[in-house]
Amino acid sequence: MRRDIAGIVLAGGQSRRMGGGDKSLLPLGSGSVLDQILSRFGPQIEILALSANGDPERFSRFGLPVLADTVEGFAGPLAGILTGLEWAIAGTPCKAVVTAAGDTPFLPLDLVDRLAAAARDHPGSIAVASSAGRRHPTFALWPTECRDALRHFLVDEDNRRVSDFIERHGHVEVEFRFVQSAGLDPFFNINVPDDLAQAARLLQSMTS
């Protein structure tokens, strides 16, 4: 378990195509999507928080800090990443933050270690996950030293595209393979009801 890197779950994504509310709180298996994410992400990292706006009480049973955006206007995942960096700088000894999307229940069990290894070989760079040739910009290791540049990018330039900032800052990609036994992309995410049903089937097959 890493103690030198903080983890942030970007948990405030809305399920507009699924009736509203937080995608991370949708039911999955015996718990929620977020329960499943934390069962895989939590053992990798000691210092962990949730990024979400609105009433933090809806996440109270998880026992984790809930970080509201420090940038106004619901500026998307990049605002959550910035807030996570600011929280890590102000309240932890960590020099980097690993983020994970709150709608991706099968994230890799070695996500943090592999991103950290890549970042160690490329000091100052953002280490970002990819699979099958596709980059997953919300699954990345962000050095705390990029905080000021990120705030300028988001606030002063009003650019909310995560990939644009990654390209500008400098990055290294880390390829994660599909889970061969299930043919599963570890970054499979839930956007529509069919995705949630598929996630339930996959989870059942993995635990049976």
UniProtKB/Swiss-Prot annotation:
The keyword Plastid does not apply. Transmembrane segments: none annotated. One of its GO terms (cellular component) is cytoplasm. GTP binds at L10, A11, G12, K23, D69, D103. One of its GO terms (molecular function) is molybdenum cofactor guanylyltransferase activity. Keywords: Cytoplasm, GTP-binding, Magnesium, Metal-binding, Molybdenum cofactor biosynthesis, Nucleotide-binding, Transferase. It catalyses: Mo-molybdopterin + GTP + H(+) = Mo-molybdopterin guanine dinucleotide + diphosphate. SUPFAM superfamilies: Nucleotide-diphospho-sugar transferases. Its EC number is 2.7.7.77. It holds the Pfam family NTP_transf_3. Mg(2+) binds at D103. Its cofactor is Mg(2+). GO terms for biological process: bis(molybdopterin guanine dinucleotide)molybdenum biosynthetic process. It is found in: Cytoplasm. InterPro entries: MobA-like_NTP_Trfase, Molybde_CF_guanTrfase, Nucleotide-diphossugar_trans. Transfers a GMP moiety from GTP to Mo-molybdopterin (Mo-MPT) cofactor (Moco or molybdenum cofactor) to form Mo-molybdopterin guanine dinucleotide (Mo-MGD) cofactor. Monomer. Belongs to the MobA family. The N-terminal domain determines nucleotide recognition and specific binding, while the C-terminal domain determines the specific binding to the target protein. This is Molybdenum cofactor guanylyltransferase. The lineage of its organism: Bacteria, Pseudomonadati, Pseudomonadota, Alphaproteobacteria, Hyphomicrobiales.
